[in-house]
């Protein structure tokens, strides 16, 4: 009987080790890398602070929630909230956008939790008198806290001759279950209409995150710096018909040895009698995170509100363990005018992704 029990235990441990190895191949970087969203365009400040304010109106509020890997381990949960307010500068065609970005991420059985609070500012410099070309420079920086629930940790120091014993010390040398640091990012973007169109436009931008290289570890020695992250973003929107348009966009990011490429397209259909200012717009699209996931996307605009859904169909090495299931995302946003006296902002024909 003991041999049978031991054999079953070995098989169970072998299966667990396979799962762990596959996970490590895919997610080791998560504790050292930034969380990501498949609906990356619904968290513009996390892409690039200089993308703040690229919308029709003077105020925008956005929220994104992501739930990932519930079929393999404790679900990874990530939430983003941002608010932006845009206003003109003097009598010129320049604008300034101020905002706030909050990011919450919880991962793993130890509830490894990260909370980021970032004020942001973005200056939009008009490059012509028609308000059709802008160069934007943005900055974002603030406070970051990371913490774990140490009572849920399991280490090899807690295994004895009789198996796992939670009463044994975990053997880790850090004394505090949380730490914090200050973080900063900046970016630049260029956006323009296409041939003077008020609906067809494009943008390109570059951002540099964590430029101050904050210390990112529960341990004091050796010190571990958070790798800076470069992000290149681009997008174009063009008319497909009187009632529809297509948006193509993507991001490439590099942080340490980790790189990520995500890109795709959305087909948007205006619904209603007024095609210039439709009450409803339906968006259908698909995105690809290279070597990781295919992402179908659905969004409905009911001005001034929007709600979007996406789902990651896993195509990475984790596909077998996750049974192809990845992450679900829900986004909700509002974009409108807080001050009706600022309606001239709608005349800025820069991209409104």
Task: Give the role of each language-model region.
Residues 1-34, 337-353:
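Cleavable N-terminal export/targeting peptides
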Residues 33-353:
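Subset of outer-membrane beta-barrel
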């Amino acid at each position: 009987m003991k041999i049978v029990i031991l054999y079953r235990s070995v098989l169970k441990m072998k299966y667990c080790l396979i799962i762990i190895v596959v996970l490590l191949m895919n997610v080791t970087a998560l504790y050292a890398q930034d969380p990501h969203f498949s609906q990356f365009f619904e968290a513009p400040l996390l892409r690039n602070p200089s993308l703040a304010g690229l919308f029709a109106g003077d105020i925008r509020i956005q929220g994104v929630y992501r739930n990932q890997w519930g079929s393999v381990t404790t679900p990874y949960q990530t939430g983003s909230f941002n608010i932006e307010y845009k206003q003109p500068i003097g009598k010129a065609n320049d604008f300034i956008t101020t905002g706030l970005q909050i990011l919450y991420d919880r991962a793993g059985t130890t509830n490894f939790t990260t909370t980021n609070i970032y004020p942001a500012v973005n200056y939009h410099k008009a490059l012509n008198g028609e308000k059709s070309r802008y160069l934007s420079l943005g900055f974002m920086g603030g406070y970051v806290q990371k913490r774990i629930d140490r009572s849920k940790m399991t280490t090899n120091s807690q295994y004895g001759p009789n198996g796992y014993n939670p009463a044994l010390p975990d053997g880790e040398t850090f004394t505090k279950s949380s730490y914090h640091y200050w973080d900063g990012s900046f970016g630049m973007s260029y956006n323009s209409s296409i041939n003077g169109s008020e609906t067809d436009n494009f943008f390109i931008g570059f951002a540099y995150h964590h430029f101050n290289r904050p210390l990112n570890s529960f341990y004091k020695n050796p010190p571990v710096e958070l790798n800076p992250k470069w992000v290149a973003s681009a997008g174009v929107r063009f008319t497909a018909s009187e009632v529809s348009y297509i948006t193509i966009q993507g991001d490439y990011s590099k942080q340490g040895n980790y790189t990520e490429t995500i890109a795709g397209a959305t087909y948007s259909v205006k619904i209603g009698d007024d095609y210039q200012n439709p009450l409803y717009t339906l968006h259908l699209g698909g995105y690809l995170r290279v070597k990781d996931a295919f992402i179908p996307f659905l969004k409905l605009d009911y001005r001034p509100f929007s709600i979007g859904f996406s789902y990651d169909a896993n195509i990475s090495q984790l596909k077998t363990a996750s049974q192809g299931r990845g992450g679900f995302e829900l986004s909700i946003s509002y974009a409108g005018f807080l001050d009706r006296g600022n309606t001239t902002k709608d005349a800025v024909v820069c991209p409104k992704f």
